[in-house]
């Protein structure tokens, strides 16, 4: 069990695999002249500076990605290619730190448009005692929900939605859009839909992260392809932190079409690259 009283700086881990089934080699692919990894590393560095007492680390199983991360001036942890998820990769990377951290934020390596302030805010929520597991969500207005529905017709496993209790506790996550909405025409008179979308961002205490790495994958986790369901299937509480995100924010880069849309978003809305 980790001891928070003898911990090192908090850690932002960026898991980055080369062997994506839908978009092989994606950490090294470029969006508007910068690699996907470069964009996410810049987000991590800016967030660490905002949060304070925090370091950034890329966790990978690929020498090419490790070399590129070194060029970007970020620490690297080499992990086994046999690890079954980015969260387990983050856990193994945290253990390699000379002074393992008390808190870890897992910033997915395919999420190049998350504002650094959102990442820093999640770390700060963990420090305030938000719980053992926390994640960021944002409520969709109707145009955003319509865009998500259209996107899922092309890429049904892109984008994750969440059902929350009144106190912010996550009840469920799904690659389907939940909840189903009855009497939508009436609800559309309100500015916001009842759908919350999940960002590719998680925070854990070391105790929760170590438990996850040792636990077997859950049944619904495997069906949905969502790591966080391992916690819910085993009775853990996940706190959801509502955040504000830019209207043009995209979900993770999973397909060649996502890459093209990311290029288009930058062309239309400007480049959010920190720096």
Regions found by a protein language model. Give the residues of each.
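Short, high-confidence coil segments that cap the C-terminus of an alpha-helix
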Residues: 53, 99-101, 128-133, 236
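A short acidic, helix-capping loop that chelates divalent metal ions and anchors anionic groups
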Residues: 20-25, 144-145, 211-212, 249-250
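Short phosphate-binding loop-to-helix
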Residues: 63-121
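Conserved core of the sugar-phosphate nucleotidyltransferase
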Residues: 114-215
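N-terminal glycine-rich phosphate-binding loop and ensuing alpha1 helix
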Residues: 3, 8-60, 116
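Conserved alpha/beta core of the MobA/IspD/sugar-nucleotide pyrophosphorylase nucleotidyltransferase superfamily
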Residues: 173, 186-275
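Hydrophobic/aromatic residues located in beta-strands of well-ordered beta-sheets
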Residues: 12, 55-58, 104, 170, ...
């Amino acid at each position: 069990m980790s001891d928070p009283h003898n911990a090192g700086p908090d850690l932002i881990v960026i898991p980055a695999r080369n062997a994506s089934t839908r978009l092989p080699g994606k950490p090294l692919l470029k969006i508007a002249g910068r690699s996907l990894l470069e964009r996410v590393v810049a987000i991590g560095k800016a967030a660490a500076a905002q949060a304070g007492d925090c370091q950034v680390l890329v966790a990978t199983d690929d020498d090419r990605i490790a070399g590129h991360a070194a060029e970007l001036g970020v620490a690297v942890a080499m992990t086994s290619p046999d690890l079954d998820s980015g969260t387990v990769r983050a856990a193994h990377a945290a253990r390699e730190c000379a002074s393992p951290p008390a808190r870890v934020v897992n910033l997915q390596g395919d999420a190049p448009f998350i504002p650094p302030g959102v990442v820093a805010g999640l770390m700060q929520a963990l420090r305030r005692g938000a719980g053992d597991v926390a994640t960021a969500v944002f409520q969709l207005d109707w145009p955003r929900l319509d865009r998500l529905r259209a996107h899922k017709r092309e890429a049904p496993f892109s984008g994750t939605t969440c059902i929350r209790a009144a106190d912010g506790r996550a009840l469920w996550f799904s690659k389907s859009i939940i909840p189903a909405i009855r009497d939508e025409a009436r609800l559309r008179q309100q500015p916001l839909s009842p759908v919350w979308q999940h960002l590719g961002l998680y925070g854990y205490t070391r105790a929760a992260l170590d438990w996850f790495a040792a636990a077997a994958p859950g049944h619904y986790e495997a069906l949905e392809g969502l790591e966080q369901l391992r916690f819910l299937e085993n009775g853990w509480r996940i706190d959801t932190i509502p955040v504000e995100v830019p209207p043009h924010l995209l979900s993770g880069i999973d397909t060649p079409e996502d890459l093209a849309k990311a290029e288009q978003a930058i062309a239309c809305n400007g480049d959010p690259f920190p720096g």
